[in-house]
């Protein structure tokens, strides 16, 4: 499952970055660089995703989850603005200036009432608690990993 998700990230990044790069660059080198970036982030991505899974915070209450992602963004050289749109847990992570301007959305909120242990059979981690049935623990983490990989290419 994680390898399939990494392949999707690689493909997405290749399509986003390639048009922004000089035609003279070798496509194979670009692809290798993107794959290397995501692979280098793999352990951090899994750890962050797992932390967000365990926190399982519902919309507008994702204080721990937001902090995990903000910390990762800052460690990777992004300037972070918090409290975006007067939402305490919303943030933007920016890098560089000028063009291109690339925006990537990430969500990391959980849904109420769908707590789930990390296993293939139904068993609540916290009975009646929140959980990540929609995979937002992965979505937020993968979006930030994509932003880091793009940053490394531009």
Regions found by a protein language model. Name each.
Residues 25-132, 141-144, 148-154:
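Acidic/His- and Gly-rich active-site-bordering loop/insert found
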């Amino acid at each position: 499952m994680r390898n399939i998700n990494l392949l999707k990230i690689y493909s997405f990044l290749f399509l986003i970055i390639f048009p922004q790069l000089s035609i003279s660059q070798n496509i194979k080198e670009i692809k290798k660089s993107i794959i290397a970036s995501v692979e280098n982030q793999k352990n951090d991505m899994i750890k962050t995703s797992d932390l967000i899974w365990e926190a399982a915070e519902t919309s507008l209450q994702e204080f721990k989850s937001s902090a995990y992602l903000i910390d990762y963004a800052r460690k990777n050289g992004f300037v972070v603005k918090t409290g975006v749109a007067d939402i305490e847990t919303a943030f933007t992570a920016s890098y560089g200036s000028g063009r291109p301007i690339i925006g990537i959305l990430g969500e990391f909120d959980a849904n109420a009432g769908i707590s789930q242990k990390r296993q293939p059979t139904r068993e609540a981690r916290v009975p009646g608690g929140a959980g990540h049935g929609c995979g937002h623990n992965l979505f937020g983490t993968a979006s930030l990993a994509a932003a880091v990989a793009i940053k490394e290419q531009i």
